[in-house]
Regions:
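Rossmann-like dinucleotide/flavin-binding elements
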Residues: 1-5, 40-53, 60-71, 76, ...
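Generic beta-strand structural signal
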Residues: 159-160, 202
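A structural signal for short, hydrophobic beta-strand segments that form beta-sheets
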Residues: 45, 156-157
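Extended, charged coiled-coil helical stalks used as long, distance-spanning scaffolds
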Residues: 26-29, 48, 161
Length: 226
C-alpha cells in the first residue's frame, strides 16, 4: 500500500549499523525486477473478496505497533518508523517505553548520534524475548551498561506528559522521569486482511510477530506447498 517494497524491514534496516540489511533489501528489489513481478504500489487491499481471477492468494500485510490508549498521553508517543525511517527530529533525552531488541538497537543508534536514551521495561531484563540471537542480546545489554543508559526494569509508564513520564516501579511507587520524546517500544500485533482458506495463505508478521529468519522460512514453506 506504500510506494516502496520492504515493509517494516525498511524501518529495521534504517539504523546506521544495518548496512547488510540495506543490501539485502536492494538485492530483493533487483530479484523482483528481474523476475518481472507485477507490483501495484500505493494500492491497499482491505477486502480479499475484491481479489478476482487468482488461483492462490498470499497475505503479507505485516503488523502494526501495539498501543495502550488507556495510558494518558499515549498519543504523544513516536513510532519506530517515525524515529528511524522518517528521521523525525528528537531531543537529547529519548525515552523508550519497552526494552526489547528493537528499542535497544534504536537506543544504541541514538547513542552513536550523541543522544541520551532512557529505557523503561516491564520485564526483569532487557531483550527478554525468547528465540533472540544470544550474540545480539549480549551485545545490546553490554552496550546499554557501558554507555550508562538509565534503565528502569520491572517498571511501566502510567502517564505521558510534556517534558516527561510518570513511571510505576516494582514496589508500586510512582516517580517522574524527564525526557524530550517517548518512543513506543511495546511491540507489534499482527494485521492480517481477510480469513485464511484453502487458497488463502498468510506469511510474515501478519501470522505472528517474528524476525527476518522466521518470515523468510514461512514464505518458503507456503510457496513450496503451493
Amino acid at each position: 500500500k506504500t510506494n516502496e517494497l520492504g515493509g517494516l524491514f525498511l524501518t529495521a534496516s534504517a539504523m546506521s549499523f544495518k548496512e547488510n540489511d540495506k543490501e539485502l533489501i536492494e538485492w530483493y528489489k533487483k530479484e523482483v525486477a528481474k523476475q518481472g513481478i507485477d507490483i501495484r504500489f500505493n494500492t491497499e487491499v482491505t477486502d480479499l473478496g475484491t481479489m478476482r481471477g487468482f488461483d492462490e492468494i498470499i497475505v503479507a500485510t505485516g503488523s502494526v505497533p501495539r498501543t495502550m490508549p488507556m495510558i494518558p498521553g499515549f498519543e504523544k508517543t513516536m513510532s519506530f518508523t517515525e524515529l528511524l525511517k522518517e528521521k523525525k527530529e528528537v531531543g537529547d533525552k529519548v525515552l523508550f517505553f519497552g526494552g526489547g531488541q528493537s528499542s535497544c538497537e534504536a537506543a544504541y543508534d541514538l547513542i552513536l548520534q550523541g543522544k541520551h536514551p532512557i529505557i523503561v521495561e516491564y520485564a526483569g531484563d532487557l531483550v527478554a524475548a525468547q528465540a533472540t540471537c544470544l550474540a545480539n542480546t549480549s551485545f545490546l545489554r553490554d552496550a546499554m551498561e557501558y554507555h550508562k543508559v538509565p534503565t528502569y526494569l520491572h517498571s511501566t509508564i502510567t502517564e505521558i506528559h510534556d517534558g516527561g513520564v510518570t513511571v510505576k516501579g516494582q514496589d508500586g511507587k510512582t516517580f517522574e522521569v524527564a525526557c524530550d520524546n517517548v518512543i513506543n517500544g511495546i511491540g507489534f500485533v499482527p494485521a492480517p486482511v481477510g480469513d485464511k482458506g484453502r487458497h488463502v495463505h498468510r506469511v510474515g508478521d501478519c501470522v505472528a510477530i517474528g524476525n527476518l529468519r522466521t518470515v523468510i522460512w514461512r514464505a518458503w514453506d507456503v510457496c513450496m506447498k503451493i
